[in-house]
Amino acid sequence: MKKNRLNLNGVVVINKVKDISSNKVLQQLKYLFNAQKAGHTGTLDPMATGVLPICFGRATKIAQYLLDADKEYIATIRLGIETDSGDAEGEIIAKSINIPELSAEYLETVLAKFRGDVVQIPPMYSALKYNGQPLYKLAREGKTVEVKSRNIKIYELELLEFNIDSLKIRVKCSKGTYIRSLAIDIGKTLGCGGHLIALQRTQSGPFKLSEAFRLEQLKDLSFEQKIASITNIESVFIDKPIYSLLEEEKDDLYKRGLFADKPHLDGTVRIYDVEKFVAIAEFDKGKLINKKFFDQDILISE
């Protein structure tokens, strides 16, 4: 007889290994924890490794916050070879022997072009849709369509190491950034083409690689240890400011969903009732525009 699934609530930060899909990680973790409900917060390509937060239960309601959060990656780019997918899993479409002589100074001038506000064209091999069809499906059929560019922001772009035909970089960027596209664009700027050969996500929102678990680690844990690996919902917003409800505001918020304008509040705010986290609220110049209640931050609820 199938065991009753547990109503778990919180986030498990996974360190995804290479050659497994994000959805496979999700399904394995859901089975491992016998969880009723689970969802991930944006896919990592099978060849990519690193931070993949998985949400259980009520935490799935805030998955979008992690989708929208800034990310950090370590990426390795191979120069002189272009592929149709922009990474090592694609077919080679061009080769060049004209790789320039690389130096730290020269590469710095190239990387400087990609810091700050950047207009980027996503790769054809992506989950973005064109007339309802995922681009990767069209690409596999040999079809090419015009992909709309998007505005992204690269906050930090650091050269870690390089040799005659490759470079390793650290990238801190906004949502919607494709590191494969960045690799392609850097290769074009160098005049020799390039593609991504390794990618590790080292941070997603507040979650860092140092606090992530590999699936194999979790399989060896006791039930109590598995539960202890789940971080509470508030951890997603740990860098957000706190507003503590006044006694006279509680009925309006809880019973009527009303909240008086707060000119000093803007963006995402944690709402506290005494010392308890109860909600996440979105403010626009002091006006409440959205809210989500979390009546308890426990990891298991009946």
From Swiss-Prot:
Asked if the record carries the keyword Transport, the reply is: no
Picking any one GO molecular function of the record gives: tRNA pseudouridine(55) synthase activity
Q: Where are the transmembrane segments?
A: none
- Which residues does the Swiss-Prot or TrEMBL record annotate as the active site? D45
Record carries keyword Phosphoprotein: no
Signal peptide as annotated in the record: none
Keywords from the UniProt entry: Isomerase, tRNA processing
First-level EC class: isomerase
Reactions accelerated catalytically: uridine(55) in tRNA = pseudouridine(55) in tRNA
Which GO BP terms, alphabetically?
A: mRNA pseudouridine synthesis; tRNA pseudouridine synthesis
Q: Tell me where on the tree of life, at the top rank, the source sits.
A: Bacteria
EC number(s) per UniProt? 5.4.99.25
Which InterPro entries does this chain map to?
PsdUridine_synth_cat_dom_sf, PsdUridine_synth_N, tRNA_psdUridine_synth_TruB, TruB_C
Q: Which HAMAP family match?
A: TruB_bact
The record describes the protein's role as: Responsible for synthesis of pseudouridine from uracil-55 in the psi GC loop of transfer RNAs.
Per the record, the similarity remark reads: Belongs to the pseudouridine synthase TruB family. Type 1 subfamily.
Q: Which PANTHER family match?
A: PSEUDOURIDYLATE SYNTHASE TRUB1, TRNA-PSEUDOURIDINE SYNTHASE
Q: Which protein is depicted?
A: tRNA pseudouridine synthase B
Origin species, per record, is Francisella tularensis subsp. tularensis (strain SCHU S4 / Schu 4)
Ranked from the top, the taxonomy reads:
Bacteria, Pseudomonadati, Pseudomonadota, Gammaproteobacteria, Thiotrichales
